[in-house]
A protein has these predicted regions:
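Generic alpha-helical transmembrane segments
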Residues: 760, 842-859
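A C-terminal functional module that forms or caps the active site or interfaces directly
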Residues: 862
Length: 955
């Protein structure tokens, strides 16, 4: 053994290969356990059997981080500038927006990372051990290497150990491997090479649980040296990841800062050179314009948009823990998914029955006894065929599982015991047998439990009606090769005939064919037991496997699998259409994994690369990355291996989503760009490590979430386009004022500009954030995570098209008001040198209102990228409709009520003014609809925004 401050690190590779006696010797203990003194000495040496917590960020720092990211800092600075520029009310308003946004973000993401605490909750408090030759109860944290543990059904395993005594000991290792089938444990030495620790039949692991039987275990590892501890260490040491959206918002902040400062400097110079104001006055004016060019409403709009997306996703069975994770889903390029329970139903189902005379198909999936046994186009009952009846009765009787009916209407059947045995009961019921009635007619009198060495189990039953002249019968089920080897006879068409090489070959060919498809196969045979049979013990308790499991009569094969979820194939196809690769990483065997992967469309080629955990250990990162470019399936993976796959995909530039439900998945879940945990079967550890939880454990829900994530990013671009385009009509009138040397009075005041940024723009922008996904959102390739939010296309559309339209409308409205009052070309404009001139006030009010009314058309235009807005329904977005009503009501409010007229430099407008304003939205809408139609025709896109060739393929 090696000393360690984190526990003990016994050479586990050697322990499974030792006999029980040698295990005691190697670990310095005995069947009587450690003495109290030795246990205390070892605890001093190895420490407590606890999962240590890593350093965690304090809640105060987490809270403050919501106020110190780049966009928040920009708003703090904007508030300071507003105070310096003599606008304290504005400064307070900007700071208040920042505070509210930060508090809201913290509240949304207030669930701290509790992965380590969740691990601790999975461990028992007290355990039974043998010390000083006596059974004792001790605290689990006081266990040391060499302690002899006593495990019984229902116990949680408190440390890693080597089994030294087993009485049908079965352990649920799903928390570590992800596979739900109980694993039978043996005390025998393992000589087979190329097995991972999790595959060792004589090792048990901390955090797993005993599902059946009992046994004794010598502790080999404690604390952080256990498999559990290693997973905790991997999880703790993971660096906090930054989402693509966080990176893009930081970059956008830099762009906005540079733009605002450049505009401030430009306006300062223009004011000095053309208007000839003093330096101080020009500086204050420039500061006001800097504040005006910072989109104060962008950050809260992004936050609220993400929060609304979280609510929408929860209705589609996806609970998102982190707001920024919503958008990251949209750039996902690879989904690494578990198999059991995510792609499959996690309910073993018999789908074929085979006898030498007939092959039957079994319909229905899951544990619900709904379905039929069919052959040659018709349904069969057990009563119709004696061979079929014996096959089904033998499978049902040679089983310890129990089916529990749903507790409520519409509920699911549940299983007590081995799921593989449970599906045998279901297949019997589908053929009209009642397992309870069968058991009443043939009560069990003896069981010879399954052993991994024998690969079979047998049960002996008393008969009401003789079988082959005997009043007792033994049913044996197990690995087909073993059962066939022990069979000397076969039932064919109701007759018992001798086993021949030809029949043996026929049986094994059928088995091999099913196994090649990744199906699990169990053989069923029986042996009549005559009371006067020579060589059979007189007492039932003296029966041994050697006495019973010989001269068997082979009956048939029961073929089963955990079937794919019915909606998964369509979801995988949708991923392919969206340019997203799906890679299966499972703890199951390679053949089974490939079979399921092929059925649901994850792999299409004839020879996909299949990596086992042991093969992956021998593969370099360079070789792995080459393999990851093609079709690949990973089977029998350990936690650190799954993590390695994720890390290599990320190194290749992929944005990776990972699904998982067990403790073993937590490192990969935390490392992934998006960790997706299962809500039903998932452990607390997996849920805490993940960014998103699926409440229905369904892969299809991930695809819905990706669609929503793509829509969120598209919507952020839409409302960013909407918010930023108003900067042009805010800037151009001011530029006209400056370039005219003051001959054209300032069409918009700073407070009017802030009215647009923090008032009229906010709610319509928020409405754009709730826009449903466009029809072609899953027909596009994944977004490049390095692509900037504010790219050239957005800037061109915002500043060179929408912005110019708004600026033209604003200036036109300003001039319209001047002309209405009698101004003409060559005359001095109303308001020059007279800020309170009534005509000038009316003109600035019109300029402000024109921007607002133009934005009504713009918000409709922004709802779709290329599709006609009429294809989605002009008024179908209620949030946008409410936003439009709000901004119109606000502008009326600011112009009608005297207390606000002085602050915002406004006045009431007349019917002619409103007649001019209401023409603006339809004009803007018509111009953009025309532009979109021209672009669609050029790109071969229909009115709904879908490429015409793609539409034809889908049809």
């Amino acid at each position: 053994m090696e000393d360690s401050k984190e526990g003990t690190a016994v050479q586990v590779a050697q322990v499974p290969r030792l006999t029980s006696d040698k295990v005691f010797s190697a670990l310095g203990t005995s069947a009587a356990g450690l003495s109290a003194q030795e246990a205390e000495a070892r605890q001093q040496r190895y420490g407590k059997n606890v999962i240590q917590s890593g350093k965690k960020k304090s809640k105060v720092l987490v809270f403050l981080s919501n106020f110190t990211h780049m966009m928040a800092i920009l708003l703090w600075v904007a508030g300071v500038i507003a105070f310096v520029a003599g606008m304290p009310e504005l400064g307070v308003a900007v700071w208040l927006v920042n505070v509210i946004n930060g508090c809201f973000s913290y509240w949304q993401e207030s669930k701290a990372d509790k992965a380590t605490e969740a691990l601790k909750k999975m461990l028992p408090s007290y355990v039974s051990v043998i010390r000083d030759g006596q059974e004792q109860k001790v605290l689990a944290e006081d266990l040391v290497p060499g302690d002899v543990l006593m495990l019984e059904e229902g116990d949680k395993v408190p440390a890693d150990g080597r089994v030294v005594r087993s009485s049908d000991l079965q352990v649920d290792q799903s928390t570590l491997t992800g596979e739900s089938n109980p694993v039978r444990k043996t005390a025998d030495a393992v000589l087979e090479e190329n097995l991972t620790n999790a595959e060792m039949p004589n090792l048990v692991f901390e955090g797993t649980s005993v599902s059946e039987g009992n046994g004794r275990v010598v502790v080999t590892q404690t604390g952080m040296a256990t498999e559990f501890g290693k997973i905790a260490s991997l999880t703790q040491n993971m660096e906090q990841k930054e989402s693509p959206l966080q990176r893009q918002l930081d970059h956008l902040t830099k762009q906005i800062t540079v733009f605002a400062l450049c505009m401030g400097v430009t306006f300062f110079l223009l004011d000095v050179l053309f208007v000839h104001n003093g330096l101080a006055a020009s500086f204050i004016f420039a500061l006001g314009m800097v504040v005006a060019f910072i989109p104060e409403g962008l950050l809260p709009t992004v936050t609220l948009s993400l929060a609304m997306a979280v609510q929408r996703m929860s209705k589609r069975n996806a609970l998102v823990k982190s707001l920024s994770s919503v958008e990251a889903l949209g750039s996902t390029s690879v989904i690494c998914t578990d198999k059991t329970g995510t792609l499959t139903q996690n309910e073993m189902t018999v789908n074929h029955l085979w006898t030498p005379a007939c092959e039957y198909e079994v319909t229905g999936v899951g544990y619900a006894p709904k379905g039929e046994v069919r052959a040659d186009g018709k349904a069969y009952a057990a009563a119709d065929d004696e061979d079929l009846r014996l096959l089904l009765e033998g499978g049902a009787l040679c089983s310890n599982a129990r089916l529990l009916p749903p507790e409520e209407d519409g509920g699911r059947y549940t299983v007590l015991g081995d799921p593989t045995e449970a599906c045998l009961l279901v297949s019997a019921q589908k053929a009209g047998l009642d397992p309870k009635e069968v058991e009443r007619r043939m009560p069990r009198v003896r069981e010879l439990p399954f052993e991994s060495r024998r690969k079979r189990m047998s049960t002996i039953h008393q008969l009401e009606e003789p079988i082959d002249g005997a009043t007792r019968v033994a049913f044996t089920k197990g690995a087909p090769n073993e059962v066939v080897r022990l069979s000397t006879k076969v039932r064919v068409n109701g007759e018992v005939v001798p086993m021949t090489d030809s029949l043996r070959s026929t049986i094994m060919n059928a088995n091999d064919s099913y196994a090649a498809d990744g199906l699990r196969v169990l053989a069923v045979a029986y042996r009549p037991i005559h009371r006067d049979e020579p060589g059979v013990p007189a007492s039932m308790s003296q029966y041994t496997p050697d006495d019973i499991e010989k001269d068997l009569t082979f009956v048939g094969l029961e073929v089963m699998q955990d079937p794919p979820r019915p909606e998964v194939a369509a979801a995988v196809a949708e991923c392919r259409r969206a340019g997203i690769r799906v890679i299966m990483i499972t703890g199951d065997y390679g053949l089974t994994a490939v079979s399921i992967a092929r059925k649901i469309g994850i792999v299409k080629g004839a020879h996909p690369k299949v990596f086992s955990g042991l093969e992956l250990e021998k593969t370099s990162d360079e070789e792995l990355r080459r393999a990851l470019k093609g079709e690949v399936v990973f089977a029998r993976m350990a936690p650190e291996q799954k993590l390695r796959v994720v890390e290599n995909l990320q190194a290749m530039g992929e944005v990776v989503a990972v699904t998982g439900d067990g403790v073993n998945d937590s490192p990969a879940l935390k490392k992934a760009d998006i960790g997706v945990a299962m809500g039903i079967t998932g452990t607390d550890v997996a849920k805490e490590a993940a960014d998103m939880i699926l409440t229905d454990d369904n892969f299809a829900s991930i695809v819905h979430a990706v669609e929503e994530g793509r829509a969120v990013y598209a919507n952020i671009r839409k409302f960013m386009l909407y918010i930023l385009n108003s900067n042009v009509p805010e800037a151009v009138p001011s530029a006209v004022y400056l370039l005219s040397g003051g001959a054209v009075p300032l069409p918009l005041t700073t407070m009017q500009i802030l009215t647009i940024d923090l008032g009229t723009d906010m709610l319509p922008a928020l409405g754009l954030g709730s826009e449903p996904p466009e029809k072609d959102v899953m027909g596009r390739p994944p977004r490049d995570p390095h692509e900037h939010l504010l790219n050239k296309e957005v800037m061109r559309k915002a500043f060179m098209w929408y912005g110019i339209l708004g600026a033209a409308a604003s200036l036109a409205a300003f001039v319209f008001a001047q002309v209405q009052a009698g101004w003409h070309m060559g005359a001095v404009m109303f308001g020059v040198g007279k800020d309170l001139d009534p005509t000038y006030v009316r003109a600035t009010t019109m300029a402000l209102a024109a921007i607002v009314f133009t934005q009504i058309g713009e918000v409709m235009n922004c709802r779709t990228e290329l599709a006609s807005v009429f294809s989605v329904g002009l008024f179908s977005n209620r949030q946008v409709n409410k936003g439009i009503l709000f901004e119109v009501a606000l502008i009326v409010f600011l112009t009608v009520f005297p207390p606000f007229q002085g602050v915002f430099h406004t006045c009431p407008l007349g019917l002619a003014d409103y007649g001019f304003l209401v023409l603006l939205p339809p004009v803007v809408l018509a111009l953009e609809e025309g532009r979109k139609a021209i672009v669609r025709r050029h790109l071969g896109i229909d009115r709904d925004g879908v490429r015409i060739e793609q539409e034809n393929v889908e049809r």
